[in-house]
Amino acid sequence: ARRYQLKDGMGDRLTLLNNWENTAFDFDEEKLRHLMDEAKQLGVDMFLLDDGWFGNAHPRNNDDAGLGDWQPNRTKLPNGISSLTRMATKAGVKFGLWVEPEMVNPESELYKKHPDWAITLPGRDTYYYRNQLVLDLSNPKVQDFVFSVVDDIMTENPDIAYLKWDCNSPITNIHSAYLKQKQCNLYIDHVRGVYNVMRRVSEKYPSLPMMLCAGGG
């Protein structure tokens, strides 16, 4: 894997400080600045901002809301992500960011606009992991959206050095509004859709390291 799969797999790995265990969802620019300074003092290479930085109509102050609305929260981060990348540069560390673009909370602008983009089973009680649903990546429009999440972040903040791409829910409520009569194709077409998005991201940002994790690990 190091030789053939990882980017520069035989090279050194960056060490990082993640804010999650310190702040969880409760942070602002000043708290993050202190953590960046402490990361430098510890000799860490990079500071990574985890979950909770996005959502305005449905702020990401807990795991009940906000997934799908990938705009910086104006209360926590009034100056946006770009101010954090500058802050990290001043502190002498690189900056990384958490995303989970395959997922959506029902309490989000995205879900209210496109409920058919989520994998849900009509006529049955909806089953949630971490209060969220999986977006239907068998749908090309959803693939375009998920790619655009990463593309918009990187276009607006080209100094981001690392993405932590999380996945906190398996596929539940198995049904695709897009596939209609081809429900047996959902698992395969969904995975192919994920691979397509990853390929597009990798082709446009070939030097961007990404950690693909599940449940934070």
Question: Language-model features: where?
Answer:
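Aromatic- and glycine-enriched glycan-recognition loops and surfaces
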Residues: 23-112, 141-145, 189-196
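Short glycine/proline-rich turn/loop motifs
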Residues: 14-20, 127-132
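Active-site-proximal, well-structured secondary-structure segments within enzyme catalytic domains
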Residues: 8-14, 50-51, 55, 100, ...
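Carbohydrate-recognition beta-sandwich/jelly-roll modules
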Residues: 1-12, 36, 40
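Active-site neighborhood of glycoside hydrolase catalytic domains
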Residues: 73-90, 111-217
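Hydrophobic faces of well-ordered beta-strands that scaffold small-molecule active sites
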Residues: 13-19, 45, 49, 95-99, ...
